[in-house]
Amino acid sequence: MTIKLAIDCMGGDHGVGVTIPAAIHFLAVHEDVEMLLVGQPDAIAAQLKRLHATANPRVHVVPASEVVSMDDPVEVALRKKKDSSMRVAINQLKEGAAQACVSAGNTGALMAVSRYVLKTLDGIDRPAIATAIPNEKGAGTTVLDLGANADCEPEHLLQFAQMASAMVSVVEQKPRPTVGLLNIGEEVIKGNEVVKQAGELLRASDLNFFGNVEGNDIFKGTTDIVVCDGFVGNVALKSTEGLAKMIGEMLRQEFSRSWFTKLLAVVALPVLTRFKRRVDHRRYNGAALLGLRGLVIKSHGSADAYAFEWAIKRAYDAAANGVIARIAQAFESHHDAAGAAPVSTSAPAADAA
């Protein structure tokens, strides 16, 4: 089966200089993929010429005259820039021309446009942002929400867990992934009322609920999935990224102190290389906007070509494993079993940067 991926070529801090090289390199190692490169034709053509990919039959240019900048308010992206590369790329999903969309654009705009164009799946009140964070076990812990919903009701946290369980079960081939609820302690009496009530809902559900987990459990890999509201999740994600950069910089400084430490660095290079690979945040780039009637993957805005290619891989894996259909099926099963309609609430604009 051929998988078609729509790439927002103009999004992010670096635009076509990153997105197109990543897409072309991914094509070279995946023969079952076609790329829909969405953006300004002249800019795309210049990159394709530089990469000697102009005549590639699996590359299709989809014109879009506008660009959503990283500073554009949601209202501008949603109401004024209707021919932006972001909007046109998402339209490819709605029209069935692509199985997934990848964008490094403004998170708030991407969530708002995606929700407006694609709508949410039945039974889901609010979409959530989910990604994997490195852990000791090497597989990565899937954490959500990472910034789409700063304030949540208990039912929303349950839905986040249901969506993530459906995704992880097919992408990572884990039939019953474990779910942890992020809290300030493992005891059921701890946490605010929302977290306590969410814990009760999770314990009563058919999910493989482990119980409350703390922040350090994300990195231990205690559970396959960790659920929290978007405010807590975004702080955890940004703290993780900052810590990884700090450790890398401190190692560089220490190994540069003298000729002896520089010699030690050479001796330790194989170990340091393996360590860097395990904690390299670029390998975990690509967050899924779960809960929509289409597969949208958000790349970090500052991603380089290597990191953006990992976001493309996330989209490819999710599309190949039918994640959207699996989530829809899961919610149909959950609500058939519950015999109750989902809570209806309005969703705020995404808060993540």
From Swiss-Prot:
<keyword id="KW-0444">Lipid biosynthesis</keyword>
<comment type="pathway">
    <text>Lipid metabolism; phospholipid metabolism.</text>
</comment>
<keyword id="KW-0594">Phospholipid biosynthesis</keyword>
<dbReference type="GO" id="GO:0006633">
    <property type="term" value="P:fatty acid biosynthetic process"/>
</dbReference>
<dbReference type="GO" id="GO:0005737">
    <property type="term" value="C:cytoplasm"/>
</dbReference>
<protein>
    <recommendedName>
        <fullName>Phosphate acyltransferase</fullName>
        <ecNumber>2.3.1.274</ecNumber>
    </recommendedName>
</protein>
<dbReference type="InterPro" id="IPR012281">
    <property type="entry name" value="Phospholipid_synth_PlsX-like"/>
</dbReference>
<keyword id="KW-0443">Lipid metabolism</keyword>
<dbReference type="GO" id="GO:0043811">
    <property type="term" value="F:phosphate:acyl-[acyl carrier protein] acyltransferase activity"/>
</dbReference>
<keyword id="KW-0963">Cytoplasm</keyword>
<comment type="function">
    <text>Catalyzes the reversible formation of acyl-phosphate (acyl-PO(4)) from acyl-[acyl-carrier-protein] (acyl-ACP). This enzyme utilizes acyl-ACP as fatty acyl donor, but not acyl-CoA.</text>
</comment>
<keyword id="KW-1208">Phospholipid metabolism</keyword>
<keyword id="KW-0808">Transferase</keyword>
<dbReference type="Pfam" id="PF02504">
    <property type="entry name" value="FA_synthesis"/>
</dbReference>
<comment type="similarity">
    <text>Belongs to the PlsX family.</text>
</comment>
<dbReference type="GO" id="GO:0008654">
    <property type="term" value="P:phospholipid biosynthetic process"/>
</dbReference>
<comment type="subunit">
    <text>Homodimer. Probably interacts with PlsY.</text>
</comment>
<dbReference type="InterPro" id="IPR003664">
    <property type="entry name" value="FA_synthesis"/>
</dbReference>
